[in-house]
Amino acid sequence: MKITAIHLYAIRLPLRNPFVISYGSYSDMPSIIVKMETDEGIIGYGEGVADDHVTGESWESTFHTLKHTLTPALIGQNPMNIEKIHDMMDNTIYGVPTAKAAIDIACFDIMGKKLNQPVYQLIGGRYHEEFPVTHVLSIADPENMAEEAASMIQKGYQSFKMKVGTNVKEDVKRIEAVRERVGNDIAIRVDVNQGWKNSANTLTALRSLGHLNIDWIEQPVIADDIDAMAHIRSKTDLPLMIDEGLKSSREMRQIIKLEAADKVNIKLMKCGGIYPAVKLAHQAEMAGIECQVGSMVESSVASSAGFHVAFSKKIITSVELTGPLKFTKDIGNLHYDVPFIRLNEKPGLGIEINEDTLQELTVFQDIVR
């Protein structure tokens, strides 16, 4: 089997509500969709959702890298040879994990369809039967965040990820307000998105949060400062998660060596796709570090890819892949049974793509043959 053509679609996914985190606000989510064709008529879909605050890639640069650098090198290659595909991509250009993830996901979709198996069967088989779905609370004033959490409990949600990271005192008020409103039996995870910057600010915040039964604090400091995460972990009993600070095996080795995290957040857009995500999970398992699979607020394409990784690995104990629930329109049909997610047994990614919606949401496109 050979890759004969790769279509690229730069789309914007409309959000139900603005998505607000420590370093930005989004009214829609820009994404690059890859449609990979083969000489056997099998088509695979991939996705890259860039975040220039995390990997240094943008929507435009990801499209450009795919069009001019990666896809020309892959025409004629066998998408089943995923180790070789990644080696070729790495030898062609350093970094750009989001662009590489889009190719990787499309290859796995093709592999699954060729073998008539869901992707999770190609990377270890199904370990988990279901995962709870966590609702993500965007940054707002304390009362509004508490009110949104209360309304989501009525819809069945039992866990929340709170976005904070603007000001330590205000963030503490936000977390206290949500905990007071939802009670002690609801899970709360706090994602700072690097917003507390350093260990001093973080330790100040943590001293005020110890009594609030927080599941974990995610990436409070600047991504590259793994030393600070290790220092904070030595000073607190609150579990710490590293997100932006983990991209590749290089950072994972440092995290393990410094004992810098209780848990890590693996994202396909940060590491380069399904294949490297599995490698990270295996590294973490050897060190006894639990994993989560998260996302950059992706469509059904990349979200389903993340779920396949999560469902196949024992060491992955939580997921935050809620992008499709946040869009008014999506190009795929990934199904959620809120408050749970359960995967089907369809081959490949297990989703159908609505080509009409894909064209409707496309801002610009191209094809490489």
From Swiss-Prot:
CDD domains named among the record's database cross-references: L-Ala-DL-Glu_epimerase
EC number(s)?
A: 5.1.1.-
Q: Name one GO molecular function term.
A: amino-acid racemase activity
Protein residues bound to substrate: 26, 51, 161-163, 191-193, 267, 295-296, 320-322
Q: Which UniProt keywords apply?
A: Isomerase, Magnesium, Metal-binding
Database matches in Pfam families: MR_MLE_C, MR_MLE_N
Q: Which domain of life is it from?
A: Bacteria
Q: Where does Mg(2+) bind?
A: 191, 218, 243
For whether the record's keyword set contains Metal-binding, the answer is yes
Key word Magnesium present: yes
> Which Gene Ontology terms describe the biological processes this protein takes part in?
peptide metabolic process
Q: Which cofactor does it need?
A: Mg(2+)
Cystine crosslinks: none
Supply the enzyme class, top level. isomerase
> Any binding details for the cofactor?
Binds 1 Mg(2+) ion per subunit.
Give the family per the record. Belongs to the mandelate racemase/muconate lactonizing enzyme family.
* UniProt miscellaneous comment: Part of a large, functionally divergent protein family. Protein modeling and substrate docking was used to predict the substrate specificity, prior to biochemical analysis.
The task this protein performs is described as: Catalyzes efficient racemization of N-succinyl-L-Arg and N-succinyl-L-Lys, suggesting that these are physiological substrates of this enzyme. Has low activity with L-Asp-L-Lys, and even lower activity with L-Leu-L-Arg, L-Leu-L-Lys, N-succinyl-L-His and N-succinyl-L-Met (in vitro).
Q: Please state what the protein is called.
A: N-succinyl-L-Arg/Lys racemase
The record lists the lineage as: Bacteria, Bacillati, Bacillota, Bacilli, Bacillales
